[in-house]
């Protein structure tokens, strides 16, 4: 895999490999290092993968050679091109195409997800490259965002065929390899598979990543990730169209035989929305049979001949696919002719489709004579035009090589083993052209390249152009850098006052080979254009319909303030929301309106590494056993607490720490977060619905419009919440008053009356306390309350004045708290027999009832079920069948009129209610009849 991370550190001269000057390091591995090099003849930047063969075993060495063999077979505009293979006794040098804009993984991490139109164009390029490989019986088996590179024009380049292999139709493969988040379920299960179906699954994951900016299958550990892949369940965000969802679901099918084929993907409705137009191939690719000399680019061959390179040896190298210095120079010159036409040594730049072979030869010979001039004619450009005449015997003596701990870098000492042919000159470095193109600067994601007829450009250049102010304005914002645009279109754009038409397109695959190269080193930093709107945004703003193509569109300088707002709007649009829901589309309800966008991108993830033997994941997990389980169980309570009390951003941060902890315990796994946080939050939504609703942390930016059905559901939820709150308050009140359900004996239980000879007054503590719990109907009260009107429905239940205390006394308060749906209490048990001479004591029953008296007396006789103790003076006034009664205050007693027998059933059918006495600031409870 070729990487383009970080700034390159220029090292002119000291380190060389063959014709290449090493300018920096792109990446390092265990047994290899990737260097950024520049060919001294063609001035083309390349990526050089230096492999230490002495550190590889036979299996890995065979894998390297197979990768080289596959790359030699492939020649596609969206596949990294192999230029040269150099091999010594212990080292192997692979010179490949250099993708300047790096991985699309990093692009998504920095810029967010792609819109579906742009993702479709990228996916068409990926699909064409994979179809090309499958047509040559080659399967990649490691398609992922890290292996999809972006060239100067933001076009896709597939890299890293390390897991690639050959396949035959109908034969199954049995090497279970790949990157876990992109691997198909049959790989995890250890089943034999067909290669193309494996790539189809990986392409489905890649398409999901392009559109959503996150992975469909993810997990903190490899076994969890494996389980989710085998389940085949993933979330669809609200911003994804139904056609795109249908395509992804048809690609991510667990049964390999039911997945879409490449031909079916090309015919899918979502893909047909925007189909790239195939332009004529200017430089036809080599056929399977041996090409003749006429099938090679004559212009490049003549130029090589002018540089002193034997044309016959070059043709033989190309026919034999030797990939030596001759072939490398030819490939690099062809590539420069395609991409850097502005700096290619041609006297008059004409459209390649209009040139004749004889014209090519004449122009090449004429220009080659000027290229071969001595370097001394151009003293200021000594560095650009320096001679590359390389004496093979004095290369090592001319330079001193720095020492390094990396054996791959130390292998540069073996330069004398790499034979280089004699070359008499070199080309100029690619420089921006003299003529200025009128264009609009834009983000790299929507870079476009103007393709203008060469004849239109020559007229009116000297006249005053009003659009120069627009050009100067854009130049100041980009640091005096001018950028051409990498996409060619069939739309015409007219610059104001210039009278020139620009042909532009939304499809990066239609890149014109006649467009000028003016990217330079500006594309190394993808963030310098963030505040400027794309040309496509301006075009769409002036069109009434997205599908409408207007032949004349005027462009004006944009306001910097509006550009900043446009940039913020675009960045907000590219962020994926956090509340995906499984099993349904989030856009089906209004709950997704105003969702706070999350800041979770691929930059928070560790890059996935391809591994072998993915089918042994479960076995490895069982062997780890106790090491993995505590990690998984320890995360659950932490996430439960976070989901109800912490903001979403803190949840994301803490879950990242949990994921990193898991990764430290399992270093061989690939800890990735992405949708893992969303997945865990979704799993916690159902059990924590009520705490989430009461959480002060806002989840939505604004109140969404509520439908009638939602309002009804919220009303029911509110009623249920109030019921639960009142029930909890009632239980707390019972516990406070020392009333427990276990203290009420059942109807079949009877309590004996023990003898109590000691006075009850000596047993009472200074403050009120009960040795036995009272029933909910009668409870002690510390204050005297007046008669309340709510008792008027019981006319016979009148209060009597207390004999020892002046003033009336209200009945003791009930403990209930406005309870709804309260069940009536069970009937009380019959009173136990009592000995006549025994002193009465407090009893314990379910509920206090009003018993009928045995005699018709004006003073009621209280049954033995009462358990209010009184003093000795009051006890003498009661018969032996009466029970002493206490209200919590000494020397006080209360008497009640008995209830009629016909009123008892109604009493038991009542429920408890409460009323507030405003005079005493107390709560009085009673039984209210149900209606």
Swiss-Prot record:
DNA damage among keywords: no
Organism name: Mus musculus
UniProt-recorded name of the protein: Serine/threonine-protein kinase SIK2
Tissue: Present in both white and brown adipose tissues with levels increasing during adipocyte differentiation. Lower levels observed in the testis.
Binding residues for ATP: 26-34, 49
Skewed-composition ranges (Pro residues): 803-815, 823-835
Modified-residue entries (Phosphothreonine), positions: 25, 175, 484
Taxonomic superkingdom: Eukaryota
Disulfide bonds: none
Compartment(s) where it occurs, according to its Swiss-Prot or TrEMBL record: Cytoplasm
Regulation: Activated by phosphorylation on Thr-175. Inhibited by phosphorylation at Ser-343, Ser-358, Thr-484 and/or Ser-587, probably by PKA, which triggers interaction with 14-3-3 proteins.
Start and end residues of each stretch annotated as RK-rich region: 595-624
Modification Phosphoserine occurs at: 358, 532, 534, 587
